[in-house]
Amino acid sequence: EIAPSDWSSDVCSSDLAQPFTMRLPLIDGHGNFGSLDDGPAAPRYTEARLAASALALTADLDEDTVDFAPNYDYTLTEPEVLPAAFPNLLVNGAAGIAVGMATNMPPHNLVEVVAAARHLLTHPEASLEDLMAFVPGPDLPAGGMIVGLDGIREAYRTGRGKFLTRATAHVESISPRRKGIVITELPYMVGPEKVITRIKEAVGSKKLQGITDVAAPKIGRASCRERV
């Protein structure tokens, strides 16, 4: 149970329940856990429990499957690692910051990662190219288009790299005389309201012309459909 005053736990549990943040959410949340543009409701208005994916990380923990060590004040013991039936770090990614450094790992597809792990177990000398045949790149929860593989390959090879993402869009007829650009997927962790604001600013400053309206119907917290 999460105490209402424990802000860090509140933020963490909200992130773990968001399908647009996690490739495989670890928290099954009931209530408003936020969107790409809005934060979650106060903890007293939400309920949460471990999702099936989280239970897969802790299954058989009481069967001596992993080593235990004392906690910080030696009053309890805690597992050094979780049994983890799947590679959670790769599947859900991670974000962290420390003094002078930061880490951001994007999410990946569960089936692809497990296939690569099984191949690596049977072929310990497998090359990066061999593994990328199974995992060609990140699998972002909200979709979007990854531009180029060079940055991804460098990140896999050295642990440092970057890649660009773009929205996914198509043109469709809005009326007999008008056509619109319909954006169906946005880059990872980019909210539709932010995009609409930037487009309107560009139109207002005359940097972008030919736009008569920008709309984003509310169709779900993890969905996107903007019409320009």
Which residues make up each language-model segment?
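Single conserved hydrophobic/aromatic residue that forms the stacking wall/gate
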Residues: 1-12, 222, 226-228
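Gly/Lys-enriched N-terminal cap/neck module of very large, oligomeric protein machines
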Residues: 157, 163-225
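Acidic-residue sensor for enzyme active/binding pockets
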Residues: 1, 47, 78, 185, ...
